[in-house]
Design a protein with these regions (language model features):
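Active-site rim helix/loop that mediates acceptor-substrate recognition in acyltransferases
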Residues: 34-64, 69, 79, 122-123
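Conserved acyl-donor/pantetheine-binding loop and adjacent beta-alpha core of acyl/acetyltransferases
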Residues: 35, 74-137, 191-214
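A short beta-loop-alpha structural element at the N-terminal edge
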Residues: 8-22
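Helix-loop element at the rim of GNAT/NAT acetyltransferase active sites that forms part
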Residues: 22-41, 84-88
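Conserved GNAT acetyl-CoA-binding A-motif
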Residues: 133, 161-174
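Conserved acetyl-CoA-binding loop-helix of GNAT-fold acetyltransferases
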Residues: 135-140, 145-159
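Conserved active-site alpha-helix within GNAT-family acetyltransferase domains
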Residues: 162-163, 175-199
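A short helix-loop-beta-strand connector motif used in the catalytic cores of GNAT acetyltransferases and
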Residues: 5, 50-66, 76, 83-88, ...
Length: 227
């Protein structure tokens, strides 16, 4: 007798946009290590307008996938975005430019960290490809963690990238848990930034005593897909 899989995976449809955005803000942001270290607001119900709009655009581009339990409950989601060489700006925004765009001042530090962590233009050039899928955020509902769902979501996304003809995927992980999933699935390390060495404009961002001993660094990875 065939076993029924514990989770099923689906592209996020418009009817589920609000629920997966709720998952991101209430089951991811309050625990996201880099955001916490900047002192950026992570209280339940708080949303950063620009980031919410960015996630919504990813959803509208059909590059986000969700996991459902046997009871049809949405228990995880992975937000992704397709990146081409032509999409890349010639110069990444500075802190003041991010602020001018409407990003909260403290959260610009997280944006700058992500920019430093993964140079998508260089990654495309180094791997001699014109298209990649960036795994922007991986969310697992708090009461479903520790069941291997994060690894399954990344694995499913790699499979979907292959189906779409995308030759390269990247992921930037601020959490040690996602880093372990990436290594397990054969991703190659791209760049590591230890939180104790995280600086912006010559200023140290994180106090050593505030750094979680489990999550000590942000790491970016990439994986070449065999099409």
């Amino acid at each position: 007798m065939m076993e029924i899989p514990e989770f099923t995976f689906h592209v996020v449809e418009s009817a589920d946009y609000e629920e997966v955005l709720h998952l991101f803000w209430d089951h991811f942001m309050p625990w996201e290590p880099a955001t916490r270290l900047t002192g950026s607001c992570t209280k339940l119900g708080y949303r950063i307008y620009n980031l919410n709009s960015m996630l919504r655009k990813m959803l509208q581009n059909n590059t986000c996938w969700m996991a459902k339990s046997q009871h049809n409950e949405i228990v995880g989601v992975i937000f992704c975005t397709k990146i081409t060489k032509d999409d890349m700006p010639s110069k990444l925004p500075t802190k003041s430019e991010y602020i001018h765009q409407g990003w909260p001042t403290d959260f610009t530090l997280v944006m700058l960290l992500l920019d430093e962590l993964c140079d998508h233009q260089k990654l495309l050039c180094d791997n001699k490809v014109n298209l990649m899928l960036d795994l922007f955020a991986l969310v697992v509902k708090t009461n479903f963690r520790g069941q291997g769902l994060a690894t399954q979501l990344i694995k499913e996304t790699i499979k979907n990238a292959q189906t779409m003809g995308v030759p390269l995927v990247s992921i930037s992980c601020s959490s040690a848990f996602t880093q372990r999933c990436s290594i397990k699935l054969g991703f190659s390390e791209n760049k590591t930034i230890l939180y104790k060495n995280w600086h912006c404009d010559g200023q140290k961002i994180a106090n050593v005593e505030d750094i979680d001993p489990i999550h000590q660094a942000a790491v970016s990875y990439y994986k070449v897909i065999n099409l």
